[in-house]
Amino acid sequence: MIFKLLKLMSWFTAQCRKQFYNLVFSTQFRYFGKGCTIDISGQVKLGKNIYIGDHVTLIVEQGACLEIADDSFIGESCYIKCFGGKIEIGRDVSINSKSYINGCGGVCIGDNTRIGTQSIIIASNHKFGEPDILVKDSITKQGIILGENIWLGARVTVLDGVKISSNSVIGACSLVSKPLDTSGVYVGVPAKKIRAL
């Protein structure tokens, strides 16, 4: 009996949390997790039926923008930070647990894309090699574009200036440091095409 009561209380708390965020963001969440960190000074546009997992961090600084389209999934402990750029997450996108997205230079993720657990997407970089300029003062922001229907395996890293063509697969633990202009299966460090799709 006590376990049933505890389960009911947990369900009730989750429903209250979801309804609160539905009101705050004027949308209908599928689920809004516990222990989330929400720090918003910029613009946010959210679609319907979005799943936000437990312990997700969403930071949208002033002058930045976050857009998440309908039916998308943000897994537990993901960290999404928009500072100075725009992050656009398309329809029915899945970003699995513990992934990190830095949107400094802008990130666009196309519809129906799957991002594996612990993946890293960083839309900025540091220049080096000029003795008169400190590394911390020399930042590039080219942005990242992921096309539609892409699958990034677990622990994939995507660096600034990359565009990945639609209908591509990036193998687990790969590093994408240059644009991938044609669809295919890519693996390795750096990622190289091993098969056309």
What residue spans do the PLM features occupy?
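Short alpha-helix at the nucleotide-sugar/activated-sugar donor binding site of glycosyltransferases
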Residues: 114, 168-169
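A generic "structured core" feature
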Residues: 151, 169-175
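Conserved beta-strand-loop-alpha-helix hinge in the C-terminal portion
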Residues: 182-196
